[in-house]
Swiss-Prot record:
Residues 1-45 form a transit peptide. Pfam families: ATP-synt (PF00231). PANTHER family: ATP SYNTHASE GAMMA CHAIN, ATP SYNTHASE SUBUNIT GAMMA, MITOCHONDRIAL. This is ATP synthase subunit gamma, mitochondrial. It comes from Ipomoea batatas (Sweet potato). GO terms for cellular component: mitochondrial inner membrane; proton-transporting ATP synthase complex.
Amino acid sequence: MAMAALRREGRRLAAAPFTSPTPLNALRSSLVSPSEEIGLSGVRSISTQVVRNRMKSVKNIQKITKAMKMVAASKLRAIQTRAENSRGLWQPFTALLGDTPSVDVKKNVIITISSDKGLCGGINSTSVKTSRNIHKLNSGPEKENKYVILGEKAKAQLVRDSKKDIELIITELQKNPLNYTQVSVVADDILKNVEFDALRIVFNKFQSVVSFVPTMSTVLSPEVVERESESGGKLGDLDSYEIEGAESKSEVLQNLTEFQFSSVLFNAVLENACSEQGARMSAMDSSSRNAGEMLDRLTLTYNRTRQASITTELIEIISGASALEG
């Protein structure tokens, strides 16, 4: 609702007439370009009512951005605790099965995690840019690269130029509060519908409200893990573990890989959600400050316009009185 109100104020602002020699886009100035100054050379031609309407619109936008900042801060606190707790879930698997981005495989699936909503800075563009770079680095005559997209914003960008490489699209993942059961269902859906040798999970790792790092986690298929362990590479230490029970080594690796993927994906989704809310909080704070600066400039314009109008009226009264006396 806050975003809809923001759009309504933007349309209202764009429709209002403004006769100053220097046109003013108040919405853009309050949200994007705080450095734009209002031209004051034509204050006499500006109606005080027009300036008051502008001030009212900017105040409404400022109220919306402040509310969105508080909502983002509340969501961030809730998600951040769960994201920190989830790190202890996937780290043992990374220690056991490794995170080996340099392993050469033929079928790469790049899982790009983004948000469903905007007004959160450049986190979605960063994820998409990182995914495209990974796609480019792993390209080759005998290699196949596919995308799995989580989130509307990555979908909107990747569909334009990589539609043929998109294997699966999942949106509205954050419609309900994120939990492990929900993400594990998504992981099962990916494992059942996508063939891969390596899953490259791209997300934004949360560091602080104003800082996030584009990150890639790699999950290998059970076949590649078994091949690498037998070849004595980075996963050669797996043979030192004794497998108990009736299950074969391949079955154990299958189960471990599936659990590793769901755990890593759960952490990645939470980290990206933290980064999203932090970026939105920062963006709305900046927008609120810009709106305050815009109000200061509009107040100055209003006062000068009103002063010019009063001065003009006084001159007309004095001139009329002088004419009558003369």
